[in-house]
Amino acid sequence: MSNKYDYDLIAIGAGSGGLSVAERAAAYGAKCAVVENGKMGGTCVNVGCVPKKIMWYGANLAHALEDAKDYGFDLENKGFDWNHLVTKREKYISGINNWYHNYLADSNIDELTGFASMVDEHTIDVDGKQFTARHIVVSPGTKPTIPDIKGAEHGISSDGFFALTACPKKVAIVGSGYIAVEVAGVLQA
């Protein structure tokens, strides 16, 4: 690394993209940092793949318990405790977030906490403090889009689904992709 810069590489965003590019560069000896203003792991870990699969697995168990009597099991199904599943899900995700903090430290990747903005092609500002790098990778992730349709203000996004404190009695899901189908299965449990 040249003494001209604080880092060889700074990745803005600690999701799959930012973490993997910093990890690879650090493995080759580059001095790296990752900037994140939220939870480590990005969308997949926090409001995507991981929490959805945990909820999906819980729903599958609920369906299996219901079907068990058809296979000779005499089980009493006392229902599905939404709050218990959400608590377990959040504990699991928190463990992944904490693992990333330790992993970055073990990989000699600095963790810069805050909101990053570009100053110039080699400089970022993180909540009032400036850092320089030979390479800056912008990998900020995304948020779900709420469609511009009448009544959209009454709906929630997939992020909102993971913020639910109770399972709603009635739901209409807009969309038919695999995420929509899996969320429908969870809510039906």
Give the location of each predicted region:
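N-terminal Rossmann-like FAD-binding beta1-loop-alpha1 element of flavoenzymes
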Residues: 7-34, 180-189
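Conserved N-terminal Rossmann-fold NAD(P)-binding element of oxidoreductases
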Residues: 12-13, 35, 138, 174-175
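Glycine-rich flavin
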Residues: 2-7, 23-30, 35-167
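Rossmann-like NAD(P)H-binding beta-loop-alpha module
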Residues: 165-189
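Conserved acidic residues
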Residues: 15, 115-117, 177
